[in-house]
């Protein structure tokens, strides 16, 4: 669902569920002159807060480590961006929130 959302927005999907160091990035995509590393969080309700709140400092560090590995392994010459896609289901219907440039490295 998140990958299709990004494709509909004009992103080129490069990878899904790319792994390094026993960690994973959900989606790697190109958006214009940026390579975008996307974390996707889904919740069935908001009892535990918004899905994007689960992207804490530790999760950001994992994403950054995997992104760094991908960046150097593939010799990327693009600007790097970290996005979060939050999918929250209300009565069975998904509400998608795309947070562009959600964080910078491991703030």
PLM features: residue spans?
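Acidic-basic catalytic patches of nuclease active cores, encompassing PD-(D/E)XK
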Residues: 1-16
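Residue-level signal for inorganic ion chemistry
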Residues: 6, 63, 82
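Short acidic/glycine-enriched loop/turn segments that link adjacent beta-strands
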Residues: 20-23, 93
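Conserved catalytic cores of phosphodiester-cleaving nucleases, focusing on short active-site segments
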Residues: 25-44, 55-57, 63
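Feature marks short, surface-exposed loop/turn motifs that line or immediately flank catalytic pockets
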Residues: 44-46, 88
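Mid-chain, well-packed structural core segment of small domains
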Residues: 47-78
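Domain-level recognition of nuclease-like catalytic cores that cleave nucleotide substrates
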Residues: 73-107
């Amino acid at each position: 669902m998140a990958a299709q959302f990004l494709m509909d927005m004009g992103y080129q999907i490069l990878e899904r569920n790319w792994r390094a160091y026993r960690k994973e990035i959900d989606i790697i995509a190109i958006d214009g002159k940026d390579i975008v590393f996307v974390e996707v969080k889904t919740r069935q309700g908001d009892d535990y807060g918004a899905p994007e709140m689960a992207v804490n400092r530790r999760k950001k560090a994992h994403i950054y480590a995997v992104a760094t590995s991908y960046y150097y392994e593939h010799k990327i010459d693009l600007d790097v961006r970290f996005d979060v896609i939050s999918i929250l289901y209300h009565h069975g219907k998904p509400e998608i929130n795309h947070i562009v440039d959600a964080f910078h490295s491991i703030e």
